[in-house]
């Protein structure tokens, strides 16, 4: 029987789940696959969040010990993943960005839902998006920047991304400004006539869900305030504001905020300095490069493990 090869301690990274009222979206898995992943890794190799954190901070983790992590405060994690964790007696780290709890409807998650539910497949969306760009003055800028774009080198640690995934993310994160991308996507969505209010209710967890996660002994951690996709490009002041506001919000639920994960795996030395100043002692990346510091712990994306099953 196949099993997961573990060479050093790391986290297992989850985002979207499907089932019940949650549709299949790009990268999502169902409850059966989550159970299969847990079995494949081996329950003996998965530590509860508090134990993994304690051993990490005391340098006593064994090479085969991993933890489970969940990013982005998604409702599907509560509805689909939490019952599976309960059935296995497991707890994990839940990394939360806070703006959604304070009245802000973060567009990036809405856009993600839209592109993976309103097209027959993700490649159809990419084809539509790339053609739609021709309507906007920024198209010439995009064409010029793409001349030197190397799909093999861009996001090369994210082996689960297709060439179209990488091209889309390069345009979104490296060529367009945040405002330009929003204008383009808002225009596409407006033409589609989709009901955004219904989407909002499906996407994110509530404050009550947050309290439940905390009460069930999972560990809450920082994930920035508004989840910028290119966090490293922010000024020191803006980065600091993102994490100070994020921490202030989560401290209403629990006073012990000591862990985080880097949104979109984007950070720099300013980020690490800010996190140290906020007394964050553990931080997770989104790739499997060897650990560089206590704020750069590797994580394996669940899609890599799913491909091994």
Go through each PLM region and give its residues.
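C-terminal active-site subregion of NodB/CE4 polysaccharide deacetylases
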Residues: 1-69, 75-76, 111, 215, ...
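Metal-dependent polysaccharide deacetylase catalytic core of the NodB/CE4 family, i.e.
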Residues: 9-20, 86-266, 297
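Short active-site segment of divalent metal-dependent hydrolases/proteases
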Residues: 74-75, 226
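Alpha-helical segments flanking ligand/cofactor-binding loops in enzyme cores
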Residues: 83, 211, 272-273
